[in-house]
């Protein structure tokens, strides 16, 4: 088996008496698409922050492509090949869609001149935003802003893409559109870790799913097997249909 693209080795993080990651060990293989689910407060956002460098674990180590990056700051991890989105898109609203991606190509991927321009246009083509290239980001719909958030992350030329609740707030047809974008990126060989409450979007996209609760891994495996796990179903009791644990959404 190839060396993991990402490996978390016994990572622990606490805020006062609240532990958001407890000796958590997790690996992602090159080109793998992993979905992460769990109730609010499960430690999902903290996990992403430790992978991206926005948060440093109290103990344990984070490895990327065989190199320990536990103490590496976020901008350096981006340059190393880790791209991420945020739950609330915050593009440069006064810049066009193209300019938003171009900034990421310059600053995140270190691309210059024609290479940066070509890369940015390719990213817009791949995320369905080419027709909006000259549109100011402040005029975009929510779905378009979500697409731009993904495009900005892809603009940094990552080998690992962290998606943080990108389907949240979208209508079902919009979720379907976004899933197609993510699927396309995955088929190009990009490693993906996707946190999402709209779980049926994950089922249609990822090959593996992890459920977190209280900073621990509760279940890890094929998506439908994880969602059928009694421990996982207990966590989601009363969660409503948006949890994606119904047969209709899981099909």
Task: List PLM regions with ranges.
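Glycine-rich phosphate-binding loops of nucleotide-dependent enzymes
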Residues: 2-251
